[in-house]
């Protein structure tokens, strides 16, 4: 939760963990109270124009979270309407990848670009947002950009969405860990990864830094699949750039080179060398807060109290 002014300055912020609230109505109640409290402490509630929210599987067109797999509540949640009715202000809800792209365009690596793609690699999976001619492309139902659920391996790993071979099962944090476990199970080759108490993208990367061949193979395979996915995306959309963001961007030093190699191998020849592959320069939390503030300005002002 944050207060952001018209210049994009983050005035105040605090954290609320959705996992602490298994009952949706309890979360909405606490969230509403915190929004009012942080506003009153920083200029007054009457100074707030609107609220922007970043959420997984959110549909900007309906203001709902729809069948998200990585939050405690299931089904369709009309979050914008629920919150608006409690706090009496305009509320806009956007898909987390869409919010990330808004933050990148306004304040980050995509500043000044008209056509670009933001790909978020994180703990929950892989999301993306397409900007075309200066505007986000949401699709008919608001689901455009689900790169993580594009099938990249026929008959591959089962995905939480119910299908097999989705990209996020190979390049998200859980996908990287699965690759490491598969490689260790398939070979008796010694590896520092076998001695790790906890396998994570970062601990695997640290093994890479120590020259561990199997750990390096994990990220070579990750980059190979990510490069194919990005090449298909670039061939379809012909953007100025593809920007990688999310929790896994800090691991990019281990997978960026094989990603670029695979991208150049698989992208359409006429645009090879013309699409930049970039890693976001913004802090993840700051970027998403700023992106949500940009979204808040797009919704028509509404208030029960002004």
Put a short name on every predicted segment.
Residues 1-4, 62-64:
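Short, conserved acidic/polar surface loops in the N-terminal third of protein domains
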Residues 2-48, 85-87, 109, 154-158, ...:
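ATP-binding/phosphotransfer module of carbohydrate and carboxylate kinases, centering on a glycine-rich
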Residues 50-177, 291-306:
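Phosphate-binding/catalytic loop of phosphoryl-transfer enzymes
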